[in-house]
Amino acid sequence: QACEVACVMAHNEEQHVLTPQRFLPRITVIKAEGQRNAITCRHCEDAPCVRSCPNDAIAQSGDSVQVRQEKCIGCKSCMVACPFGVMQVVVTPQAAGLVKASAHKCDLCQGREAGPACVENCPAQALTLADDETLITLAKQRRLRSACQEVQPWQRATPLCSQPNAGAKVRQMAMTPPRGEPDKLAAEVRKSHFEEIYQPFTPQQAQQQAARCLTCGEHSICEWTCPLHNHIPQWIELVKAGNIAAAVALSHQTNCLPEITGRVCPQGRLCEGACTLRDESGAVTIGNIERYISDQALASGWRPDLSQVKPSGKRVAIIGAGPAGLACADMLVRHGVQPVVFDRHPEIGGLLTFGIPAFKLDKSLLARRRAIFSEMGIRFELNCEVGKDISMATLLAEYDAVFVGAGTYRSMKAGLPNEEAPGVYDALPFLIANTKQVMGLAASAQEPYVNTAGLNVVVLGGGDTAMDCVRTALRHGARQVTCAYRRDEANMPGSKKEVKNAREEGALFEFNVQPVTLELDENGRVNGVRFLRTELGAPDAGGRRRPTPIPGSEFVMPADAVIMAFGFHPHRMPWLEAAGVALDSQGRIKAGVESRYRYQTSQEKIFAGGDAVRGADLVVTAMAEGRHAAQGILDYLARKTTPLH
């Protein structure tokens, strides 16, 4: 899909667009079993779209068909007329809340010196500008292939005719060996401790897996699907060449925590999920290669070089040392701005440190990264809570700008009867207290340590947080741990890898069950969960089928402890509202790419990003917003506006 990415960037000043909603390629790649094709406007000689337009907004221009946007009224007549289904009508926001609908199609990158970007960037050279003579030749070649009974190269069958003109990338794809996974500790071994379960790649493994990358263009689809737009094919090429220092330096241009994201990112939903090889021999193991180069380089003493950075004299207060705050601080310090990071916890990382269990993320990595950030010039004020130990008024008075990356710490409730009873725990306090226990830190009254050894534990929920709770309880030595989820396994929001790991470690799963009430014993302590069985009904607004209770299907599952993992809401920050920062109906901070300066709030000196803005989401989306907000802060300090790509 390098052609799609190239097309979008060619129409956006060679920059990635800032939101998925703006990713509107004028060429579409279709992948289906036995078929791969790119579809776009054919610039027909007697174009039906031209004839259908009631306002003369589409016209022949030489050998191409062009849309005159100033005349387009968004009527969709061209969409109906196009026999190839390649016309779109897109809606773009205008001033004062207005929108404009206009036709959107391939324009052959009119005015672009190098010609169509899709042709230039296709790694397999499968796209070309064709005249009549070329089309006749291609038709002859197709007829010849049909006569020879050839199949597509990626189907790995041996054709009856030779393929002297097959592209190098197609041959490379056909010869690519299967994906290799990192070694993993045996389930019985890993259940006995909280150490990371995945072993790092050896240099040989890293080389073998890097060699599988097809290098799909300068800006590949894996780069686009990564919220940070990491230069993935480029640093994989450097790994192939054995240049780890250059690879890690390149990865740090877009990501200040590559050793973290390599471990905890859901690559299967992002970069690896988009990999061209995914459906053939398995996606390139991007996350493990990222982890390898970071671990190798940092262990050997590599550090970011900021020797050429000149201090600007500006200072920015950052509230929250989680992914958003750290990414913001990293970008600011690289531009000569002094970031001072305030956090209520004794270590940086936010939920990276205290929410993600140590068996997924070794906590020593955050301590090392704090030392690196400090060497770069970032100052940390830990065990310091805004609104308690320091006021927002002080920050606004003493700093040139403030960034809020406070995350989301308030657990969602299901509204079940007896959910406040003894033995019922919210997921996040349970995980935070456990991590503090592992790190040798004292528990707090708000987050008391809970040991589930010998207990029958039921975890309600189906996301990664639920899996973290399940696997933590198993490591405590719980007698039995069951995860109960209201939909089927295919609809679980959590990572398939995490579900697989939990099963290997002994977790039980109960699908299509909806909790009705929490049962109590004579002492008022939880002793079970009453469920109704469900079946999947009509889709909800998000397209997922709703679980519908089955009448008369009630049953009680015994439980000594119940952990509720339904997700998180933004927690209340009265000091934020007092400063004049507008919130939405769900308590999230109103800020985004459409702000005057990226991620500026209703209070001009305050910027925000991450989960406090978008709700609970991924580490990389929080980091991406932290970086966007840093750009907004830099522009605000310089009083200039960055184009809204």
Go through each PLM region and give its residues.
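Glycine-rich Rossmann-fold phosphate-binding loop(s) that bind the pyrophosphate
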Residues: G320-P323, G462-G463, D611
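Flanking helices and flexible, charged tails adjoining ferredoxin-like Fe-S electron-transfer domains
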Residues: E13-R51, Q69-K71, K76-M173, P178-E188, ...
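A conserved FAD-binding loop/helix module that cradles the flavin
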Residues: C469, A612-L637
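Beta1-alpha1 glycine-rich phosphate/pyrophosphate-binding loop at the start
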Residues: T176-D183, A187-Q199, H229-A241, S251-H252, ...
